[in-house]
């Protein structure tokens, strides 16, 4: 039995170079280089323009591991080719963001401004004072940085003030009745 996700091959676009060395897979593209070690229960084969994940043995969880490995590899290929981005929106009076190089300065109603240093391979933009766009080649890192920024002031349930993802719906609670 083969995982439905792992059955689908990953197409390698032009301009992306994939190197398979045992369990270590390196993907190079215009946006950088990503390296990941895949679990030993999964075998990765490379043809001219495709990557295929196969179960290396018949252990109970190898189907799930093959599907996960395929999804991770597809994200690596897409990341170095087109990249990933997460958009955050700030809602609240006086909430502002400003990107300065590899730093993000936030004013979110605390007694002090919050300065965040971006990790290697991650860039941040602020098209307006209330919008933050986090970009990078590694989907996991981009999402983690966006989650760390949101965690500083998550949306509160009564007025909806805080930092939220662009597509996030905040369900507002009703205020206490007298």
UniProtKB/Swiss-Prot annotation:
<dbReference type="InterPro" id="IPR020040">
    <property type="entry name" value="Ribosomal_uL6_a/b-dom"/>
</dbReference>
<keyword id="KW-0689">Ribosomal protein</keyword>
<keyword id="KW-0699">rRNA-binding</keyword>
<comment type="function">
    <text>This protein binds to the 23S rRNA, and is important in its secondary structure. It is located near the subunit interface in the base of the L7/L12 stalk, and near the tRNA binding site of the peptidyltransferase center.</text>
</comment>
<keyword id="KW-0694">RNA-binding</keyword>
<comment type="subunit">
    <text>Part of the 50S ribosomal subunit.</text>
</comment>
<comment type="similarity">
    <text>Belongs to the universal ribosomal protein uL6 family.</text>
</comment>
<dbReference type="InterPro" id="IPR036789">
    <property type="entry name" value="Ribosomal_uL6-like_a/b-dom_sf"/>
</dbReference>
<dbReference type="GO" id="GO:0003735">
    <property type="term" value="F:structural constituent of ribosome"/>
</dbReference>
<dbReference type="Pfam" id="PF00347">
    <property type="entry name" value="Ribosomal_L6"/>
</dbReference>
<dbReference type="GO" id="GO:0019843">
    <property type="term" value="F:rRNA binding"/>
</dbReference>
<keyword id="KW-0687">Ribonucleoprotein</keyword>
<dbReference type="InterPro" id="IPR019906">
    <property type="entry name" value="Ribosomal_uL6_bac-type"/>
</dbReference>
<protein>
    <recommendedName>
        <fullName>Large ribosomal subunit protein uL6</fullName>
    </recommendedName>
</protein>
<dbReference type="GO" id="GO:0022625">
    <property type="term" value="C:cytosolic large ribosomal subunit"/>
</dbReference>
<dbReference type="InterPro" id="IPR002358">
    <property type="entry name" value="Ribosomal_uL6_CS"/>
</dbReference>
<dbReference type="GO" id="GO:0002181">
    <property type="term" value="P:cytoplasmic translation"/>
</dbReference>
<dbReference type="InterPro" id="IPR000702">
    <property type="entry name" value="Ribosomal_uL6-like"/>
</dbReference>
């Amino acid at each position: 039995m083969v995982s439905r996700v792992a059955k689908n091959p990953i197409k390698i676009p032009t301009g992306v170079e994939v190197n398979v060395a045992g369990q270590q897979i390196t993907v190079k593209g215009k946006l950088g280089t990503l390296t990941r070690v895949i679990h030993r229960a999964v075998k990765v084969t490379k043809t001219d323009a495709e990557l295929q994940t196969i179960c290396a043995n018949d252990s109970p969880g190898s189907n799930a591991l093959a599907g996960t490995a395929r999804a991770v590899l597809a994200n690596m290929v897409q990341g170095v080719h087109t990249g990933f981005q997460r958009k955050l929106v700030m809602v609240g009076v006086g909430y502002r963001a400003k990107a300065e190089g590899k730093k993000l300065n936030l004013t979110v109603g605390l007694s002090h401004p919050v300065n965040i240093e971006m990790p290697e391979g991650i860039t941040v933009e602020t098209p307006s004072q209330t919008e933050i766009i986090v970009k990078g080649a590694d989907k996991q890192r981009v999402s983690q940085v966006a989650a760390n920024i949101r965690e500083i002031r998550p949306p509160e349930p009564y007025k909806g003030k805080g930092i939220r993802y662009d597509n996030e719906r905040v369900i507002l609670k009703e205020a206490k009745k007298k």
